[in-house]
Amino acid sequence: MHPVLRQMKPLPASVVKLEAESEGLARLQGGAAPEVHPRVQMKQEAAEAYIPASNVFRDNEGEEAEGLRHLKYESGRMLRKDHPSKRVLDERDFEKSPENGISAAEAHLKSADLVTAYEHTVKAEVNFQTTFNNNVRTLIAREEVVIGLMHLWDFVEAFLENPVSKALTAQLFLIVQHCRDEGVLRESLLNIAEPESRWLVDLLNLLQTIVVQERSLAVGEKVAAINYSVITLSKHYARKIFNSVFVPIDKEAKINTFYMRTVVQILVLSDDLGMYRNERIERAVSGARQRELNDRELMYRLREALTSNGLSEIEGGEDSARVRSKENWGAGAGVGAASARYPHLLDYEEKENPDGSVSFQQHERGTQSHENGGHAEPAYSRRQLGRFY
Protein backbone atom coordinates (compact mmCIF):
# COMPACT_ATOMS: atom_id res chain seq x y z
CA MET A 1 0.00 0.00 0.00
CA HIS A 2 1.20 3.49 -0.80
CA PRO A 3 2.30 5.52 2.27
CA VAL A 4 -0.23 8.24 1.48
CA LEU A 5 -3.10 5.77 1.42
CA ARG A 6 -1.79 4.17 4.58
CA GLN A 7 -2.12 7.50 6.37
CA MET A 8 -5.60 8.15 5.03
CA LYS A 9 -7.09 4.70 5.65
CA PRO A 10 -6.77 3.12 9.11
CA LEU A 11 -5.30 -0.36 9.22
CA PRO A 12 -7.19 -3.23 10.91
CA ALA A 13 -5.95 -4.71 14.13
CA SER A 14 -2.82 -6.82 13.88
CA VAL A 15 -4.42 -9.80 15.60
CA VAL A 16 -7.25 -9.95 13.09
CA LYS A 17 -4.81 -9.71 10.19
CA LEU A 18 -2.69 -12.60 11.47
CA GLU A 19 -5.74 -14.78 12.02
CA ALA A 20 -7.02 -14.09 8.51
CA GLU A 21 -3.69 -14.95 6.94
CA SER A 22 -3.32 -18.18 8.88
CA GLU A 23 -6.85 -19.38 8.19
CA GLY A 24 -7.00 -18.55 4.48
CA LEU A 25 -5.37 -21.63 2.97
CA ALA A 26 -6.94 -23.89 5.57
CA ARG A 27 -10.41 -22.80 4.49
CA LEU A 28 -9.48 -23.33 0.84
CA GLN A 29 -8.34 -26.87 1.54
CA GLY A 30 -11.61 -27.70 3.26
CA GLY A 31 -10.00 -29.24 6.30
CA ALA A 32 -7.87 -31.71 4.29
CA ALA A 33 -4.84 -33.52 5.63
CA PRO A 34 -1.60 -31.54 5.98
CA GLU A 35 0.17 -33.84 3.52
CA VAL A 36 -1.83 -32.41 0.61
CA HIS A 37 -1.22 -28.80 1.61
CA PRO A 38 0.56 -26.87 -1.21
CA ARG A 39 3.39 -25.71 1.02
CA VAL A 40 3.96 -29.22 2.34
CA GLN A 41 4.01 -30.59 -1.20
CA MET A 42 6.53 -27.96 -2.27
CA LYS A 43 8.79 -28.86 0.62
CA GLN A 44 8.50 -32.55 -0.21
CA GLU A 45 9.26 -32.01 -3.89
CA ALA A 46 12.29 -29.89 -3.01
CA ALA A 47 13.56 -32.63 -0.70
CA GLU A 48 13.09 -35.31 -3.38
CA ALA A 49 14.77 -33.17 -6.01
CA TYR A 50 17.76 -32.76 -3.71
CA ILE A 51 18.63 -36.40 -4.34
CA PRO A 52 21.19 -36.39 -7.19
CA ALA A 53 19.86 -38.00 -10.33
CA SER A 54 21.75 -41.03 -11.61
CA ASN A 55 21.57 -42.66 -15.03
CA VAL A 56 22.88 -46.20 -15.32
CA PHE A 57 23.31 -45.92 -19.09
CA ARG A 58 25.22 -42.63 -19.30
CA ASP A 59 26.92 -41.83 -15.99
CA ASN A 60 30.72 -42.24 -15.71
CA GLU A 61 31.28 -42.76 -19.41
CA GLY A 62 34.14 -45.14 -20.16
CA GLU A 63 34.77 -46.03 -16.52
CA GLU A 64 32.57 -49.11 -16.13
CA ALA A 65 33.39 -52.64 -17.21
CA GLU A 66 31.71 -53.96 -20.32
CA GLY A 67 28.30 -55.38 -19.46
CA LEU A 68 28.29 -53.98 -15.90
CA ARG A 69 25.71 -51.30 -16.73
CA HIS A 70 23.42 -53.98 -18.08
CA LEU A 71 23.76 -55.96 -14.84
CA LYS A 72 23.07 -52.87 -12.69
CA TYR A 73 19.97 -52.05 -14.69
CA GLU A 74 18.59 -55.58 -14.46
CA SER A 75 19.47 -55.80 -10.75
CA GLY A 76 17.58 -52.61 -10.00
CA ARG A 77 14.60 -53.90 -11.94
CA MET A 78 14.53 -57.17 -10.00
CA LEU A 79 15.10 -55.55 -6.57
CA ARG A 80 12.42 -52.92 -7.10
CA LYS A 81 9.58 -55.37 -6.46
CA ASP A 82 10.66 -56.41 -2.94
CA HIS A 83 12.55 -53.29 -1.85
CA PRO A 84 10.83 -51.46 1.08
CA SER A 85 10.91 -47.79 0.18
CA LYS A 86 9.88 -46.50 3.65
CA ARG A 87 11.94 -48.73 5.87
CA VAL A 88 13.48 -47.09 8.93
CA LEU A 89 16.89 -48.45 9.97
CA ASP A 90 17.74 -48.96 13.63
CA GLU A 91 20.93 -49.90 15.47
CA ARG A 92 20.38 -53.65 15.10
CA ASP A 93 20.41 -53.41 11.30
CA PHE A 94 24.02 -52.25 11.34
CA GLU A 95 25.30 -55.41 13.00
CA LYS A 96 27.43 -57.59 10.73
CA SER A 97 26.09 -60.96 9.73
CA PRO A 98 28.38 -63.87 10.76
CA GLU A 99 27.60 -65.67 7.50
CA ASN A 100 28.74 -63.13 4.91
CA GLY A 101 30.06 -60.20 6.93
CA ILE A 102 27.48 -57.77 5.52
CA SER A 103 24.95 -56.03 7.71
CA ALA A 104 21.29 -55.67 6.76
CA ALA A 105 21.59 -51.88 6.67
CA GLU A 106 24.51 -52.04 4.24
CA ALA A 107 22.62 -54.42 1.94
CA HIS A 108 19.56 -52.18 2.14
CA LEU A 109 21.54 -49.08 1.19
CA LYS A 110 23.19 -50.81 -1.78
CA SER A 111 19.88 -52.12 -3.03
CA ALA A 112 18.38 -48.64 -2.56
CA ASP A 113 21.11 -47.18 -4.76
CA LEU A 114 20.43 -49.75 -7.48
CA VAL A 115 16.67 -49.21 -7.32
CA THR A 116 17.03 -45.42 -7.35
CA ALA A 117 19.40 -45.53 -10.32
CA TYR A 118 17.00 -47.85 -12.15
CA GLU A 119 14.02 -45.58 -11.52
CA HIS A 120 15.93 -42.47 -12.61
CA THR A 121 17.15 -44.24 -15.75
CA VAL A 122 13.65 -45.39 -16.67
CA LYS A 123 12.27 -41.91 -16.08
CA ALA A 124 14.95 -40.32 -18.25
CA GLU A 125 14.38 -42.81 -21.09
CA VAL A 126 10.62 -42.34 -20.92
CA ASN A 127 10.97 -38.56 -21.06
CA PHE A 128 13.37 -38.79 -24.00
CA GLN A 129 11.04 -41.12 -25.91
CA THR A 130 8.03 -38.90 -25.22
CA THR A 131 9.93 -35.83 -26.39
CA PHE A 132 11.03 -37.64 -29.54
CA ASN A 133 7.48 -38.74 -30.36
CA ASN A 134 6.12 -35.23 -29.84
CA ASN A 135 8.83 -33.66 -31.99
CA VAL A 136 8.37 -36.17 -34.81
CA ARG A 137 4.58 -35.84 -34.68
CA THR A 138 4.82 -32.06 -34.88
CA LEU A 139 7.34 -32.10 -37.73
CA ILE A 140 5.75 -34.68 -40.03
CA ALA A 141 2.39 -32.92 -39.71
CA ARG A 142 3.89 -29.88 -41.47
CA GLU A 143 3.56 -29.78 -45.24
CA GLU A 144 6.94 -28.06 -45.55
CA VAL A 145 8.65 -31.09 -44.01
CA VAL A 146 7.07 -33.43 -46.57
CA ILE A 147 8.12 -31.24 -49.49
CA GLY A 148 11.61 -30.65 -48.09
CA LEU A 149 12.17 -34.35 -47.40
CA MET A 150 11.09 -35.19 -50.94
CA HIS A 151 13.55 -32.65 -52.36
CA LEU A 152 16.35 -33.89 -50.07
CA TRP A 153 15.82 -37.53 -51.04
CA ASP A 154 15.60 -36.67 -54.74
CA PHE A 155 18.81 -34.65 -54.52
CA VAL A 156 20.67 -37.48 -52.77
CA GLU A 157 19.55 -39.97 -55.43
CA ALA A 158 20.69 -37.61 -58.19
CA PHE A 159 24.02 -36.96 -56.48
CA LEU A 160 24.69 -40.68 -56.05
CA GLU A 161 24.16 -41.19 -59.78
CA ASN A 162 26.47 -38.31 -60.74
CA PRO A 163 28.82 -37.42 -57.86
CA VAL A 164 31.22 -35.42 -60.08
CA SER A 165 28.60 -32.88 -61.17
CA LYS A 166 29.62 -29.33 -60.27
CA ALA A 167 26.02 -28.12 -60.12
CA LEU A 168 25.01 -30.89 -57.71
CA THR A 169 28.13 -30.27 -55.62
CA ALA A 170 27.18 -26.61 -55.27
CA GLN A 171 23.68 -27.63 -54.18
CA LEU A 172 25.20 -30.07 -51.69
CA PHE A 173 27.18 -27.29 -50.00
CA LEU A 174 24.05 -25.15 -49.91
CA ILE A 175 22.08 -27.93 -48.22
CA VAL A 176 24.88 -28.58 -45.73
CA GLN A 177 24.81 -24.92 -44.73
CA HIS A 178 21.23 -25.43 -43.53
CA CYS A 179 22.34 -28.02 -40.96
CA ARG A 180 21.99 -26.32 -37.60
CA ASP A 181 24.34 -28.58 -35.65
CA GLU A 182 27.96 -29.46 -36.23
CA GLY A 183 28.03 -33.21 -36.04
CA VAL A 184 27.69 -36.53 -37.78
CA LEU A 185 24.84 -35.45 -40.05
CA ARG A 186 26.83 -32.61 -41.61
CA GLU A 187 29.90 -34.78 -42.15
CA SER A 188 27.85 -37.61 -43.60
CA LEU A 189 26.08 -35.26 -46.02
CA LEU A 190 29.42 -33.93 -47.24
CA ASN A 191 30.55 -37.53 -47.86
CA ILE A 192 27.18 -38.86 -48.98
CA ALA A 193 28.69 -40.70 -51.97
CA GLU A 194 31.21 -42.58 -49.80
CA PRO A 195 30.54 -46.08 -48.39
CA GLU A 196 30.74 -44.83 -44.78
CA SER A 197 27.64 -42.68 -45.37
CA ARG A 198 25.50 -45.56 -46.59
CA TRP A 199 23.65 -45.63 -43.27
CA LEU A 200 22.36 -42.11 -43.91
CA VAL A 201 21.12 -43.09 -47.38
CA ASP A 202 19.22 -46.02 -45.86
CA LEU A 203 17.69 -43.77 -43.22
CA LEU A 204 16.64 -41.21 -45.86
CA ASN A 205 15.03 -43.96 -47.93
CA LEU A 206 13.03 -45.15 -44.93
CA LEU A 207 11.90 -41.66 -43.96
CA GLN A 208 10.96 -40.83 -47.54
CA THR A 209 8.93 -44.01 -47.83
CA ILE A 210 7.07 -43.43 -44.56
CA VAL A 211 6.53 -39.66 -44.65
CA VAL A 212 6.24 -38.90 -48.39
CA GLN A 213 5.00 -42.01 -50.17
CA GLU A 214 2.65 -43.47 -47.56
CA ARG A 215 0.08 -40.68 -47.79
CA SER A 216 -2.74 -42.88 -46.49
CA LEU A 217 -1.13 -43.38 -43.06
CA ALA A 218 -2.20 -41.25 -40.13
CA VAL A 219 0.30 -39.17 -38.19
CA GLY A 220 0.33 -41.63 -35.29
CA GLU A 221 0.94 -44.54 -37.64
CA LYS A 222 3.85 -42.70 -39.23
CA VAL A 223 5.37 -42.04 -35.80
CA ALA A 224 5.05 -45.74 -34.96
CA ALA A 225 6.64 -46.73 -38.28
CA ILE A 226 9.56 -44.35 -37.70
CA ASN A 227 10.13 -45.77 -34.20
CA TYR A 228 10.05 -49.32 -35.57
CA SER A 229 12.58 -48.40 -38.25
CA VAL A 230 14.86 -46.74 -35.70
CA ILE A 231 14.79 -49.78 -33.39
CA THR A 232 15.41 -52.17 -36.30
CA LEU A 233 18.39 -50.18 -37.58
CA SER A 234 19.79 -49.83 -34.06
CA LYS A 235 19.68 -53.57 -33.44
CA HIS A 236 21.20 -54.31 -36.85
CA TYR A 237 24.23 -52.06 -36.39
CA ALA A 238 24.61 -52.95 -32.68
CA ARG A 239 24.93 -56.63 -33.59
CA LYS A 240 27.48 -55.65 -36.22
CA ILE A 241 29.54 -53.79 -33.62
CA PHE A 242 29.56 -56.57 -31.02
CA ASN A 243 29.49 -59.40 -33.57
CA SER A 244 26.97 -61.21 -31.40
CA VAL A 245 23.24 -61.60 -30.95
CA PHE A 246 23.49 -60.37 -27.35
CA VAL A 247 23.99 -56.61 -27.08
CA PRO A 248 24.17 -54.81 -23.70
CA ILE A 249 21.05 -52.80 -23.13
CA ASP A 250 22.97 -49.59 -22.47
CA LYS A 251 24.82 -49.79 -25.80
CA GLU A 252 21.61 -50.54 -27.67
CA ALA A 253 19.93 -47.56 -25.97
CA LYS A 254 22.80 -45.25 -26.97
CA ILE A 255 22.69 -46.37 -30.62
CA ASN A 256 18.92 -45.95 -30.55
CA THR A 257 19.35 -42.43 -29.17
CA PHE A 258 21.82 -41.61 -31.94
CA TYR A 259 19.32 -42.62 -34.62
CA MET A 260 16.47 -40.75 -32.92
CA ARG A 261 18.48 -37.53 -32.80
CA THR A 262 19.51 -37.99 -36.44
CA VAL A 263 15.87 -38.44 -37.47
CA VAL A 264 14.90 -35.20 -35.74
CA GLN A 265 17.82 -33.38 -37.39
CA ILE A 266 16.82 -34.67 -40.84
CA LEU A 267 13.21 -33.58 -40.33
CA VAL A 268 14.33 -30.13 -39.14
CA LEU A 269 16.60 -29.85 -42.19
CA SER A 270 13.68 -30.87 -44.41
CA ASP A 271 11.56 -28.18 -42.78
CA ASP A 272 14.20 -25.56 -43.59
CA LEU A 273 14.43 -26.76 -47.20
CA GLY A 274 10.66 -26.92 -47.64
CA MET A 275 10.24 -23.30 -46.57
CA TYR A 276 11.54 -22.17 -49.97
CA ARG A 277 8.36 -23.41 -51.66
CA ASN A 278 6.09 -20.53 -52.70
CA GLU A 279 3.12 -22.29 -54.29
CA ARG A 280 0.76 -24.56 -52.44
CA ILE A 281 0.64 -28.08 -53.85
CA GLU A 282 -2.83 -29.62 -53.81
CA ARG A 283 -3.35 -33.33 -53.49
CA ALA A 284 -4.86 -34.96 -56.57
CA VAL A 285 -8.23 -36.52 -55.77
CA SER A 286 -10.77 -38.33 -57.88
CA GLY A 287 -13.59 -36.49 -59.60
CA ALA A 288 -16.18 -38.06 -57.33
CA ARG A 289 -14.53 -36.55 -54.25
CA GLN A 290 -13.99 -33.07 -55.66
CA ARG A 291 -16.14 -30.26 -54.35
CA GLU A 292 -18.46 -28.76 -56.93
CA LEU A 293 -17.78 -25.29 -58.30
CA ASN A 294 -19.78 -22.48 -56.80
CA ASP A 295 -21.20 -19.65 -58.90
CA ARG A 296 -18.22 -17.39 -58.36
CA GLU A 297 -15.70 -20.05 -59.36
CA LEU A 298 -17.84 -21.07 -62.34
CA MET A 299 -17.98 -17.50 -63.68
CA TYR A 300 -14.24 -17.14 -63.15
CA ARG A 301 -13.59 -20.32 -65.16
CA LEU A 302 -16.00 -19.11 -67.85
CA ARG A 303 -14.19 -15.79 -68.09
CA GLU A 304 -10.86 -17.60 -68.49
CA ALA A 305 -12.36 -19.81 -71.19
CA LEU A 306 -13.76 -16.81 -73.09
CA THR A 307 -10.53 -14.85 -72.97
CA SER A 308 -8.26 -17.80 -73.80
CA ASN A 309 -6.57 -18.14 -77.20
CA GLY A 310 -8.32 -20.67 -79.43
CA LEU A 311 -5.28 -21.20 -81.65
CA SER A 312 -3.58 -23.23 -78.93
CA GLU A 313 -6.44 -25.70 -78.97
CA ILE A 314 -6.33 -25.99 -82.77
CA GLU A 315 -2.58 -26.49 -82.78
CA GLY A 316 -2.83 -29.01 -79.95
CA GLY A 317 -5.03 -31.25 -82.05
CA GLU A 318 -8.09 -31.07 -79.81
CA ASP A 319 -10.36 -29.67 -82.54
CA SER A 320 -8.49 -31.09 -85.49
CA ALA A 321 -11.51 -33.19 -86.45
CA ARG A 322 -13.63 -30.04 -86.85
CA VAL A 323 -11.19 -28.37 -89.28
CA ARG A 324 -11.96 -29.11 -92.92
CA SER A 325 -9.27 -30.36 -95.25
CA LYS A 326 -7.83 -28.25 -98.04
CA GLU A 327 -9.75 -30.20 -100.68
CA ASN A 328 -13.07 -29.33 -99.03
CA TRP A 329 -12.34 -25.65 -98.58
CA GLY A 330 -13.34 -24.95 -102.17
CA ALA A 331 -16.63 -26.87 -102.08
CA GLY A 332 -19.52 -24.61 -101.25
CA ALA A 333 -21.67 -21.78 -102.47
CA GLY A 334 -19.90 -18.76 -103.91
CA VAL A 335 -16.79 -20.61 -105.05
CA GLY A 336 -15.96 -21.48 -108.62
CA ALA A 337 -15.60 -25.01 -109.87
CA ALA A 338 -11.97 -24.38 -110.66
CA SER A 339 -11.12 -24.88 -107.01
CA ALA A 340 -12.02 -28.53 -107.34
CA ARG A 341 -10.56 -29.03 -110.81
CA TYR A 342 -7.32 -27.11 -110.24
CA PRO A 343 -6.28 -27.52 -106.59
CA HIS A 344 -2.79 -26.21 -107.37
CA LEU A 345 -4.29 -22.82 -108.17
CA LEU A 346 -5.51 -22.34 -104.60
CA ASP A 347 -3.64 -19.87 -102.45
CA TYR A 348 -4.13 -18.95 -98.83
CA GLU A 349 -3.31 -15.81 -96.90
CA GLU A 350 -3.06 -15.29 -93.17
CA LYS A 351 -3.90 -11.82 -91.96
CA GLU A 352 -3.71 -10.42 -88.45
CA ASN A 353 -6.48 -7.99 -87.58
CA PRO A 354 -5.96 -4.88 -85.41
CA ASP A 355 -7.92 -6.47 -82.54
CA GLY A 356 -5.46 -9.34 -82.29
CA SER A 357 -7.56 -11.96 -84.14
CA VAL A 358 -6.33 -13.90 -87.14
CA SER A 359 -8.22 -14.17 -90.44
CA PHE A 360 -7.63 -16.81 -93.05
CA GLN A 361 -8.56 -15.88 -96.64
CA GLN A 362 -8.67 -18.11 -99.70
CA HIS A 363 -7.61 -16.82 -103.10
CA GLU A 364 -9.09 -18.78 -105.98
CA ARG A 365 -7.62 -18.54 -109.44
CA GLY A 366 -10.72 -19.01 -111.56
CA THR A 367 -11.18 -19.04 -115.37
CA GLN A 368 -13.24 -16.46 -117.21
CA SER A 369 -14.12 -16.41 -120.93
CA HIS A 370 -12.42 -13.84 -123.08
CA GLU A 371 -14.12 -11.85 -125.79
CA ASN A 372 -12.38 -13.84 -128.51
CA GLY A 373 -13.16 -17.18 -126.87
CA GLY A 374 -9.79 -17.61 -125.10
CA HIS A 375 -9.00 -17.70 -121.45
CA ALA A 376 -8.72 -14.41 -119.67
CA GLU A 377 -6.23 -13.48 -116.96
CA PRO A 378 -6.71 -15.42 -113.76
CA ALA A 379 -9.25 -13.72 -111.58
CA TYR A 380 -9.19 -13.75 -107.80
CA SER A 381 -12.24 -14.41 -105.73
CA ARG A 382 -11.94 -14.07 -101.97
CA ARG A 383 -13.76 -15.90 -99.27
CA GLN A 384 -13.14 -15.41 -95.59
CA LEU A 385 -12.77 -18.79 -93.94
CA GLY A 386 -13.12 -17.74 -90.33
CA ARG A 387 -11.72 -15.88 -87.36
CA PHE A 388 -9.92 -17.59 -84.53
CA TYR A 389 -9.45 -15.85 -81.21
Curated annotation (Swiss-Prot):
- Predominant location category: host cell
Q: Which InterPro entries match?
A: ADV_PKG3, L1-like
One GO CC annotation: host cell nucleus
Q: Where is this region: Disordered?
A: 350-389
User: Localized where?
Assistant: Host nucleus
**Which parts of this chain are annotated as the region Interaction with packaging protein 1?**
1-131
Keywords attached to this entry: Host nucleus, Late protein, Phosphoprotein, Viral genome packaging, Viral release from host cell
Query: Which Pfam families does the annotation name?
Result: Adeno_52K (PF03052)
Post-translational modification remark: Cleaved at different sites by the viral protease during virion maturation.
Q: Where are the compositionally biased (Basic and acidic residues) regions?
A: 362-374
Induction: what does the entry report?
Expressed in the early phase and late phase of the viral replicative cycle.
Superkingdom is Viruses
One GO term of the biological process aspect: viral DNA genome packaging
The further comment given in this record reads: All late proteins expressed from the major late promoter are produced by alternative splicing and alternative polyadenylation of the same gene giving rise to non-overlapping ORFs. A leader sequence is present in the N-terminus of all these mRNAs and is recognized by the viral shutoff protein to provide expression although conventional translation via ribosome scanning from the cap has been shut off in the host cell.
Q: What biological function has been recorded for the protein in this entry? A: Involved in viral genome packaging through its interaction with packaging proteins 1 and 2. After proteolytic cleavage by adenovirus protease, L1 52/55k protein is removed from the capsid during viral maturation.
Q: Which proteins does it associate with, and in what oligomeric form?
A: Part of the genome packaging complex composed of packaging proteins 1, 2 and 3; this complex specifically binds to the packaging sequence on the left end of viral genomic DNA and performs packaging of the viral genome. Interacts with hexon-linking protein IIIa; this interaction is required to promote correct genome packaging.
Q: Please report which protein family the annotation says this sequence is part of.
A: Belongs to the adenoviridae packaging protein 3 family.
Protein name as it appears in the record? Packaging protein 3
Q: Which organism is it from?
A: Canine adenovirus serotype 1 (strain CLL)
User: Gene that codes for this?
Assistant: L1
